[in-house]
Amino acid sequence: MSPLECSECFGDQLLHRTYTWQLTLHSRPNFTRKRDTRSESLEIPINVVLPQRGTAEPFPRLHNLHSIPRCAQQAALPRLSRRMASQHSYPLNRFSSVPLDPMERPMSQADLELDYNPPRVQLSDEMFVFQDGRWVNENCRLQSPYFSPSASFHHKLHHKRLAKEFVLQEENKSLREENKALREENRMLRKENKILQVFWEEHKASLGREESRPPSPLPQKDSASLEVVKKDHVALQVPRGKEDSTLQLLREENRALQQLLEQKQAYWTQTEDAAAPAEESKPAPSPHEEPCSPGLLQDQGSGLSSHFEEPRGPPAPQEDSKTLRALREMVSNMSGPSGEEEAKAGPGLPDGCQPLQLLREMRQALQALLKENRLLQEENRTLQVLRAEHRGFQEENKALWENNKLKLQQKLVIDTVTEVTARMEMLIEELYAFMPGRSQDPKKPSRV
């Protein structure tokens, strides 16, 4: 007998080594015939599978490697029945008990009446079965003619599938509950962020009011702004469009004021140029008489508003008239009662004092507008800071959610690994239970 290594029946993964012994059976010559004194021989290959790692015990196995009888006499040899073959095919000195019929296929699992489940391993979502010396996918495997699982095997497999489905449903349910809790936490954080924004705005508004108190207070405007701020705080909303609209209004007011100043300067230069030759031609007026220049308005009893209504200069367009009216109303509102008193006392003042008074009022209005503009810019900066903090909170929530998800996945992987190791140990114990008794217990294979 010469052992030959064979690795063709194991595919790509060499899990075992196969040794082949050539058994030669010699038949006695027939002495009844005097002439026929030849002896006949029959060669039968037997494969013995030895695992590479873990166990050192051989597993004799017969493969369908038998050749067709070479002659009629060889085919007419008596066949050994299966019942005469011993069930124990171990150790190697008992190969005579193995069925040596070359035309007979190896005994299947159903013939031996063994309830044996093949080894199974689950990787991710796929199940692999160890069949015919290799790991095969359970869904794509080919049914071997020597593999015939019993009804109990299918029953166990069905129960395992039901248990896996139940476990998956429980995991999905727990993940949904965790997702719901994270959403609630995110909603609460958003509410807290809004409340903090409101408190910050109130604090900034109070500080701005204390710093930007002009010498001429504006009680009406402050009360209106306070009411607007309170309404916004109750609603817990800080619309950005409103801020943009206020900034745009302030810019338009600044532009209108600049245009008004330019028009007044041009108007005053024209009046001065026209009044210079008139004063040279006319005698010096008495101190009780008021000089009447041709560029001034006829109706002097209307006070300061007369300069904004009907100037004798070139006719201004419709937009300039609208801006002038808006500026007149704004200056009158911001000047308050002092402006009304000055307007009442306006006709009694000389012409040189009226433009100075107007310049003072416009300067006060510009200062108030600049202070409001600064406050709005500071509020805009604080809003940007709060938005950045809100983004940071959102990123932290996202990181926490990802961490929890990774922890769940790690737990699932650990559970699956422990389950696979437990199943492998059970399978190894079953394999050793099917093997015959030995003098020494073999060592268990080391875990990979």
UniProtKB/Swiss-Prot annotation:
Stretches for region Disordered: 206-226, 270-321
Superkingdom as given in the UniProt entry: Eukaryota
The UniProt record lists the keyword Phosphoprotein: yes
Pfam families: Chibby
Composition-biased stretches (Basic and acidic residues): 279-291
Keyword Phosphoprotein: yes
Modification sites for Phosphoserine: 41, 86, 89, 97, 124, 144, 148, 150, 212, 225, 335, 338
Keywords of the record: Coiled coil, Phosphoprotein
Coiled coil segments of this chain: 163-198, 242-267, 356-414
Family named by the database record: Belongs to the chibby family. SPERT subfamily.
PANTHER family, A to Z: LEUCINE-RICH PROTEIN (PTHR21533), PROTEIN CHIBBY HOMOLOG 2 (PTHR21533:SF13)
Assembly behavior: Homodimer. Binds to NEK1.
Protein name (record): Protein chibby homolog 2
